[in-house]
Amino acid sequence: MSRFFLRNAFMFVVYAYLYIPIIILVTNSFNKDRYGLSWKGFSWNWYERLFNNDTLIQAAIHSVTIAFFAATLATIVGGLTAIALYRYRFRGKQAVSGMLFIVMMSPDIVMAVSLLALFMVVGISLGFWSLLLAHVTFCLPYVTVTIFSRLNGFDSRMLEAAKDLGASEVTILRKIILPLALPAVVSGWLLSFTISLDDVVVSSFVSGVSYEILPLRIFSLVKTGVTPEVNALATIMIVLSLALVVLSQLITRKNNH
């Protein structure tokens, strides 16, 4: 009984540590008190101010745009890479797998400096394209590993049987591999979208003054204190994240049935 109680108490403390700050943030986004020190009544005032703050709205649009295209490109390239690693034998296969894990384990600051040096050598100006390429780079390994792990759990004899029955590689890819990998594809896209939307370190190195994204804008604002508009914006982002998670679960459940 005591062990059961301690386990549940520990889990309660962990979840409280994770979610109480989020609850406070969401609550303060509706609080009339600017500093959130006490509850002074429900108000939509901070959301109205947020939507009148053109700088924050523009930064949010930039972030969502970068995250969408980065996640989509990373999912396409990462999916094809995962299929190649799972389906075919080729020289350098182990090296490709190793490089993916190296990118995943590299500190953000190392990734940021490396990409900045590359863009300077190649001549890519800092802005939209440098941000997009950087975000695709650090999202790609996560998508590849997610999809490959899903494919690696399937019996490859099913693919060989389809090939023996005369199915072409395109048919096998379209009729067997892609439907089986769909939950991992959706998960990989959502993971990439979240990682891209949340990145600060790499983005701070490769972004230009002409294309400011939301994490960098918020980072510059919180140096002087968290404003209620930031709380309101964070609440909207939380709702968006929850909606994406629910959508992912619905797609996965539909595919499994």
Swiss-Prot record:
What is the source species?
Answer: Haemophilus influenzae (strain ATCC 51907 / DSM 11121 / KW20 / Rd)
Q: Which BP terms from GO are recorded?
A: transmembrane transport
Give the way it sits in the membrane: Multi-pass membrane protein
Q: Where in the cell is it found?
A: Cell inner membrane
Listed under GO cellular component are:
plasma membrane
Q: What Pfam family is a match for this entry?
A: BPD_transp_1
UniProt keyword list: Cell inner membrane, Cell membrane, Membrane, Transmembrane, Transmembrane helix, Transport
Database matches in SUPFAM superfamilies? MetI-like
Entry's transmembrane regions: 8-27, 66-85, 101-120, 129-148, 177-196, 232-251
Q: Which InterPro entries match?
A: Bact_Polyamine_Transport, MetI-like, MetI-like_sf
Residue ranges in the Cytoplasmic topological domain are 1-7, 86-100, 149-176, 252-257
Family to which the UniProt record says this protein belongs:
Belongs to the binding-protein-dependent transport system permease family. CysTW subfamily.
Limits of the ABC transmembrane type-1 domain: 60-248
Reported function: Required for the activity of the bacterial periplasmic transport system of putrescine and spermidine.
Q: Which domain of life is it from?
A: Bacteria
Record-given protein name: Spermidine/putrescine transport system permease protein PotC
Question: According to the UniProt topology, which residue ranges lie Periplasmic?
Answer: 28-65, 121-128, 197-231
